[in-house]
């Protein structure tokens, strides 16, 4: 019986495994649709961990809507090269990498294989070094970019973001089904943008998690001070939004 040892073998996987071998845990923030606050939550979690003195990285992989740098107030510049590329440094020693470091504020007109190759290239050349935690801001939905990320970053733990909207929750249920069928580790579900009025529509914890094996991590109320704190890390840390996000992330680390 003969077989081809190159079948289904991608040498880049070995490189990626080496890149992340000194990263303690990797949390990938995902959502079934846009507009649920995934990027703000990703940034808040990373800032909270960095402020605690944890060695933390933040990877903004929302190819078509990168915005984490806006929350951080980080100036984008082409990363320094040293046998790879080094992440930018943001507030509190947070290591930060974004597709926007290469594209600026321009759109990225890529699709299919081009997106996959760009993802693999950026993952393979970025040198994170020793990290306690890496937070990944994933693209919304379940397209090629998301599937590629969870395929190649095997240590990922998925954290799913929803809102009280019935539409959002139903999309999250479908997303959960996909991740469970792919045998991905799902850290839990967070419900964002909860208000008194929205709370009347908010589904039960069992409905949000959709499966006994997927914990419901908590609800984050609407924060009226969040908008004016964008771009000011010190001010962001004072908001109820970041404080609540920090409590949730601390509960799973």
What residue ranges belong to the model's regions?
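Extreme N-terminal, non-catalytic leader segments
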Residues: 1-32
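Helical mechanochemical/support elements of P-loop NTPase systems and associated helical scaffolds
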Residues: 19-22, 41, 45, 63-64, ...
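Walker A/P-loop phosphate-binding motif and the immediately C-terminal alpha-helix
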Residues: 25-62
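Conserved beta-strand scaffold positions in the cores of enzyme catalytic domains, especially
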Residues: 25-26, 58, 94-96, 216-219
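Phosphate-binding loop that captures ATP/GTP phosphates
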Residues: 55-105, 109, 116, 120
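Cytosolic-facing regulatory segments adjacent to core modules
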Residues: 102-143
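Conserved catalytic-core segment of NTP-binding enzymes
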Residues: 125, 133-228
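C-terminal boundary of histidine-terminating zinc-finger modules
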Residues: 230-242
């Amino acid at each position: 019986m003969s077989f081809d040892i190159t079948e289904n073998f991608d040498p880049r996987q070995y490189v990626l495994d080496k890149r992340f071998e000194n990263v303690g845990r990797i949390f990938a923030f995902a959502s079934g649709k846009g507009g649920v606050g995934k990027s703000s939550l990703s940034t808040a979690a990373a800032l909270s961990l960095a402020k605690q003195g944890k060695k933390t990285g933040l990877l903004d992989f929302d190819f078509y809507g990168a915005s984490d740098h806006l929350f951080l107030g980080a100036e984008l510049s082409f990363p320094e090269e040293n046998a790879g590329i080094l992440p930018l440094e943001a507030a509190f020693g947070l290591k930060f990498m974004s597709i926007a470091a290469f594209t600026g504020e321009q759109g990225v007109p890529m699709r299919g294989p081009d997106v996959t190759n760009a993802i693999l290239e950026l993952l393979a050349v970025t040198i994170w070094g020793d990290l306690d935690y890496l937070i990944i801001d994933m693209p919304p939905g379940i397209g090629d970019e998301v599937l590629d990320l969870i395929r190649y970053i095997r240590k990922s733990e998925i954290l799913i973001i929803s809102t009280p909207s019935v539409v959002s929750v139903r999309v999250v249920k479908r997303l959960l089904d996909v991740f469970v069928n792919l045998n991905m580790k799902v850290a839990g579900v967070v419900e964002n943008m909860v208000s008194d009025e929205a709370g009347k529509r908010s589904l039960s914890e069992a409905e949000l998690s959709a499966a006994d094996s997927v914990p419901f991590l908590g609800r984050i109320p609407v924060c009226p001070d969040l908008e004016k704190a964008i771009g000011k890390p010190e001010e962001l840390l004072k908001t109820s939004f970041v404080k609540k996000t920090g409590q949730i992330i601390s509960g799973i680390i």
